[in-house]
Each structure stands twice: as structure tokens, then as C-alpha cells.
Amino acid sequence: MNKEYIMVIDEGTTSLRAVIFNKKMELLFQSQKPIEMICPADGEVEQSPLEIYEKTVEAMKDVLETGGLKAEQIAAIGITNQRGTWALWSKKTGMPYTNFITWMDTRSERSKPYFSTHEKFNELFPDQMDMMPPWNFVLSFQQMCEERPELLEIVKDSDTLYGTIDTWIIYKLTGGRSFTISSSSDHTGPFYVLGNMDEKYKSAELFGMHQDILPQVLDEADDYGRLDPDILGEEIPIFGNIADQQSSLFSQGCINTGDAKCTCGTGAFVNVNIGDKFLTNHSVTSYIAWTLDGQSVNCIEGVAGNAGTCLEWAKGQIGLIEDFSSMEDIAQSVSDNDGVYFVPALAGMECANYLVPSAKGSFQGLTVRTKKEHLLRSIMEAIAFAIANVFDQLEIIGFDIEKIYIDGGVSKSNMICQKLSNVTGLTVIRSKNTESTALGAAEMAAIKLGWMKEEDVLNYVESDREFIPDENRQRDKEEFEHWKQYVEVICNIYRQ
């Protein structure tokens, strides 16, 4: 039987999917499963490793059934995953010691007073605490140890393994035979601060972790092992593994220095290909984008907050919309925001130069005239403004960007794309394939299979629509300035 398909496992934040691509990199079938968010306390956002693995296997079986395919028709598996999310588990039993601590978790803030006077910490990470993201392992793990002191002994035990979601899934899918991580997931993981390769070993040293607790780092198009035949009845090779934002950067064809994309999903992330350069400051961070044949390409990244999370909240928690299909019409049923602005700090404020994990979201400018349409419009505008703010910071540090490739579920909004174009003054090109993270993982597996080369990725880039600045540009730029003022006010309140 011909092996003509690639299966991609896309481990997202709120759901996971199994997706089937053909040799033309066309998405044919998919199966999606929701993932429960576990919030034990304020600022804590976890997920169950066992639920994620079990639902991954369910999705893999479902997508084959949906497509009427057999496992022996799958040439390879590719994986892409949310980043900065980690767990500990036992090598002997394969059972987790902890839940996954997600990239949205902010418990790390509670550890900062402890480490501010910690001699060993300040020796290993001099003047770096303020640059540590909320998902930093050292800060989060210390807080966990306050409640579970036994974890300090667990990480010293040679039976204990650490991994991000890709490491866990590959470990389980291969029956424990492959303990690996991609260079992109490794470098955007919780062990790094400034991106220096020795930082993860410093973090391990701080807690006396045993030397084999960290997974082997591989290229993105590499051999990650074989699927346990007990799962689908076939030993399918796992040939691609790439972190989600880097995956969409690749599949959008951003393979040349200076190419920029924004992915708007649960969160909004801006990435720019910077070749072999490396730059990190308080607004943006450099990461490995991908490694092929041992050669790494780097990207600079700016986080633009919780895009999809805000819209899910608007729908599910406060009932501004009944379904997302009506969102655009409702927001545009009013001519402007009537002076209402939304500060999108529903899980802290993380937006380039605005990094205040303890901040809380708010509406500003409410009056007796304010309607729910204004509230919804202000939320959608805040998503565009947050992304524009990242490009502001990139311009300040010297990046000359001409156009923005945009993808992800939130990019389906014409209003958000147009607002982004107006505020930045740049052409915004929306991808026809809004599932670019899965596509990038399929392309990495295809490269390992010999079906394509890196430069062939440009053959699979399709645009849906281009947005250029229109007659509302001046108004939108003024509203952007007002929004930044409100964000600054809220951040200052919670910095105190």
C-alpha cells in the first residue's frame, strides 16, 4: 500500500488535533479534541499529561477513520506544540509527577521576593529576574516546591524526566524509547532567559537536578523514533517536530532574513526571521526558529497577549456574542468604539514592553452610552493594537519591516487585519491556510522523507487577502495612542 500521507499532531493550548496532509501539502482531514484547563489557584494554569496523551491517541484514530485511511498509508508523523509548557514524569512507570505547567501560568511571580536575595540565583542569573518570562522554570518550580517539598528530591532522582509537550507525547507514542525535543521547543522552553545555551544547565544546577533529566535536542526534520505498533498497528516514523510559532513562520514562507509573520490563535505572537543574528531585550526575545542539517536559523519574537483567549472570554464568560460567526457584524454595527478601550490582561499583561504578570484586564472609558457592541469592538481593537505595539518595538530597535504575514483563527477577522494595517502602515497579507502551525510540521516531516527541500516551502504559500492602510488610518492611529495610555495606567497600578 502506498504511503502518501503525513499525519500531524498539533498540540495547542485549548485543543489538540490530528491532521492529515497529502504530498501536495493539502490539508485533507482533521480530528479535534478539547483540552481542559486546570486552575487550582489564582494565576495557576495547568493541564493533565494523561488527558493530553489519551486524547492524542483518540484524535489519531478518529482522523484515520474520518478519512477512510489505514495506518500503513501514513508515511510519517509530524508534531507541533504549544511552547513553554512543561511537566515531570517517571521513566520507570511513565506516569507524571506533575501536571503540565502551561505558558499561561503566572505563579512564578510569587517566587521573586525569595530569589531577590538568593545568593546562588543571583550568581547564576545576574540582573536577569525582570527579564524572566512568567513560564520560567526556576521561578515556577520554586513556587511548586513551597507546596510540594518532595519535588526537590524527585528532580534529583535518576528516574525523573523533564519535558515539554512534544517530549512527553513522543516519549509516550514511542513506548518510552525516545526522550527527545526539537531545537525550537528546547530554546523557547522554560529553562532559558536570554537564550544562552548554558542557561538550562544553570537552572538544573540551582536545584541539583540529575544530569539525565533533560531530553536530547534534535533538528526539526529528524528521526524522533517509531510509533509503538500497539497504538495504530503500524510502526510509523516520527520525522518532524517544531514549536508552534516557529512552525507557522516556516510554513508562511518566512525563510529569508527580515520576513515577518503574526500568528493569532489563543495568543498572538510576532516572529521575524533574523538569520544567524541574536538579539534580546525587555521587549523582544531571540529564539532558534528551526535547525536543518545542523544549521540553525534564528527568529526574534514579540508576544502580543492573549488574542483568542479574549474572544473566548467575550463569548463564554460575559456573553457579548453567541457564536464567532456573528462577531464581525456586531462589532461593526457601531461606527467607532465611543471612547471605550480594553486592556487585555486576562492572564496578566504580556505585550512586548508591557510585561506585568500580575496585571488584571479592564474596560476604560465606560459611560451611560456604552453598549455591548462597543465592548466587543474594543476587545477586537485591543488585539490589533497589541500586535501593532510589537511592531512599534521592532521599529524602535531598528527592524525595517515592509509587510506582515498573518495566520491563525483570529486572523479571519477583516476588522482586526485592517486595523493592524492602518496602525502600522504596513501591508497585511492573510494566509489562505489559517492552520499554518500544522502545515509547518507536515513540511518538516516531508523534508525528512525527501519529498521536498527547505526552499520548496514557498510553493505552498497561498494568500487569502491583502490589507493596505485605508481612509481610517489617522483615526486608528490616534485610538492606538489612547489605548497605550490606558495600558500604561493599568500596568503602573499593578507594578506597585
Tell where the protein language model's regions lie, with residue ranges.
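Gly/Ser/Thr-rich active-site cleft segment
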Residues: 11-13, 124-245, 311, 315-316, ...
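ATP-dependent carbohydrate kinase catalytic cores
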Residues: 185-295, 305-309, 314, 322-325, ...
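Short beta-strand-to-turn element immediately C-terminal to the catalytic PLP-Schiff-base lysine
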Residues: 21-22, 87-90, 144-146, 171-174, ...
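Active-site nucleophile and cofactor-binding loops and adjacent substrate-binding regions
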Residues: 47, 75-81, 101-104, 128-136, ...
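Phosphate/pyrophosphate-binding loops at sites that engage ATP/ADP/AMP, CoA/4′-phosphopantetheine
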Residues: 56-75, 148-155, 201-211, 390-402
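Glycine/Thr-rich phosphate-binding loops that ligate phosphate moieties of nucleotide
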Residues: 1-32, 39, 75-116, 150, ...
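N-terminal phosphate-binding loop and adjacent alpha-helix
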Residues: 31-71, 116
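Short glycine/proline- and acidic residue-enriched helix-loop micro-motifs
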Residues: 45, 121-132, 296, 470
